[in-house]
């Protein structure tokens, strides 16, 4: 456990963020390896089928992850206030609420999958392959949820190392499972999806056993599973649904944009898939410091240490801006090589469009870096509405661009989408946080 209410914020934030960074990097490394394995052994059609549905699976998975991170903010506040009974109860309630959400999403996702894929304009020749892949991912949502709850709770009490170790084991098993099921057993994209779910299941078991043995304060009892604390339930639903919907709104906009991308042909789908995979690595530190600040602000708010919160937000923003500069240099020097590394494709249209995406979007990363830090800090401080408004603006912006710029300009319209919406999103966030009592209050 790590208490973020004591010690130098500059050091605490970095040491807390490092394991999260390595965990996210491992996850993205698996994603890239999965893409390369599918592209190399199953071909462009299979890669395009997975790429055309990635946004849909991300929409569902990111909602659950966001919701669990929202629940964990309440856990972090309980830990900061040194209220261990409420901390344990928050874990029990997180499991119950999360499982209910996962079951509903699983049933709804499987029932309406075909209409959704057709709405996304998934090409007819890719539809069966795409359905196989996404069906397994959706069927495994309960497993995904359990891991997210356990990992988020561990981070809430300052333990970012254990989720990293568990994830490392999961990633190795996942890549090994891909090679076994795809290359040896010839299960196609179905094998890739099955390997993902099975590796997550092993991660859940390992994480649960470790948590039970290591942290006596988190050994939940039957009473902790009862949704009987009205105040806690309201706070958890408010925080969890806010962060879940915040992630979903972002992904709904991206999903709508994907419907336009799917009309631009197989090479553009592959190019965009590659560009997004690489940009996820480029933007990894935004998510890392965002998660860090949600926990950091939650613990320090619970302890009533306001000045530490302000200083932490400024430090995290500075760290991410340094990372932005490194991203720009990378995109302009080896961007095309990275595209080839991810896809294995030498098609000029794929290389050119994916590289163009990276070169343009990285120039505006400073804006989205501030967005991620401020938005997650506000969630940690209990502000739910404005981050949702900001995410809603992103969703609306992407929908409008999908309907206007993409039909007019093709893929360059897609490339312009995110920089445009980032500038729109940042306005309400800055207006709100600069007015918040926690920012103005003097200590």
What are these regions (language model features)?
Residues 15-34, 136, 170, 199-203, ...:
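Transmembrane helical elements of multi-pass membrane transporters/channels
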Residues 68, 136-155, 163-171, 192-207, ...:
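Short runs within selected transmembrane alpha-helices of multi-pass transporters and secretion channels
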Residues 20, 24, 36, 73, ...:
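Transmembrane alpha-helix boundary and packing residues in multipass membrane permease domains
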Residues 47-107, 144-163, 271-330, 335, ...:
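Small-residue-rich hydrophobic transmembrane alpha-helices
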Residues 29-48, 117-124, 180-187, 248-277, ...:
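Helix-terminus/linker motif at the lipid-water interface of multi-pass membrane proteins
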Residues 4-42, 55-70, 74, 99-106, ...:
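N-terminal transmembrane alpha-helices
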Residues 1-17, 75-140, 184-241, 297-364, ...:
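Short alpha-helical transmembrane segments in multi-pass integral membrane proteins
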Residues 14, 18, 30, 67, ...:
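Residue-level signal for transmembrane alpha-helical positions in Major Facilitator Superfamily
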């Amino acid at each position: 456990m790590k208490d973020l209410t004591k010690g130098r914020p500059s050091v605490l934030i970095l040491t807390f963020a490092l394991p999260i960074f390595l965990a996210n990097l491992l996850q993205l490394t698996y994603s890239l390896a999965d893409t390369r394995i599918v592209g190399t052994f199953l071909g462009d059609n299979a890669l395009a089928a997975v790429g055309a549905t990635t946004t849909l699976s991300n929409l569902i998975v990111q909602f659950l992850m966001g919701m669990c991170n929202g629940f964990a903010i309440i856990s972090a506040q309980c830990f900061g206030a040194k209220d261990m009974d409420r901390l344990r109860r928050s874990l029990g309630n997180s499991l119950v609420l999360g499982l209910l959400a996962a079951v509903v999403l699983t049933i709804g996702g499987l029932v309406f999958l075909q209409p959704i894929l057709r709405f996304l304009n998934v090409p007819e020749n890719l539809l069966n392959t795409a359905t196989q892949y996404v069906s397994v991912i959706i069927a495994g949502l309960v497993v995904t949820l359990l891991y997210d709850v356990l990992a988020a709770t561990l981070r809430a009490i300052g333990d970012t190392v254990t989720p990293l170790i568990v994830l490392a084991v999961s990633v190795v098993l996942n890549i090994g499972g891909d090679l076994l099921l795809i290359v040896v057993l010839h299960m196609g994209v179905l094998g890739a999806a099955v390997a993902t779910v099975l590796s997550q299941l092993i991660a859940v078991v390992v994480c649960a056993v470790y948590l039970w043995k290591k942290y006596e304060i988190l050994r939940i009892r039957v009473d902790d599973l009862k949704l009987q604390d009205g105040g806690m339930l309201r706070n958890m639903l408010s925080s969890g649904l806010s962060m879940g919907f915040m992630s979903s709104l972002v992904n709904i906009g991206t999903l709508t944009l994907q419907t336009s991308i799917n009309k631009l042909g197989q090479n553009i789908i592959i190019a965009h898939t590659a560009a997004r995979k690489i940009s996820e690595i480029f933007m990894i530190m935004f998510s890392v410091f965002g998660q860090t600040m949600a926990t950091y602000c939650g613990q320090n708010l619970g302890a009533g240490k306001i000045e530490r919160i302000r200083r932490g937000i400024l430090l995290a923003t500075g760290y991410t801006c340094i990372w932005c500069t490194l991203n720009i240099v990378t995109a302009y020097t080896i961007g095309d090589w990275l595209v080839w590394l991810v896809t294995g494709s030498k098609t000029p249209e794929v290389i050119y469009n994916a590289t163009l995406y990276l070169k343009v979007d990285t120039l505006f990363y400073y804006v989205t870096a501030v967005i991620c830090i401020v938005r997650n800090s506000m969630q940690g401080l209990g502000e739910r509405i404005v981050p949702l408004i900001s995410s809603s603006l992103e969703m609306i912006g992407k929908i409008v661009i999908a309907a206007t710029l993409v039909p007019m300009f093709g893929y360059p319209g897609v490339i312009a989408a995110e920089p445009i919406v980032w500038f729109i999103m940042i306005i309400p966030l800055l207006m709100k946080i600069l007015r918040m009592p926690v920012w103005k209050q003097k200590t």
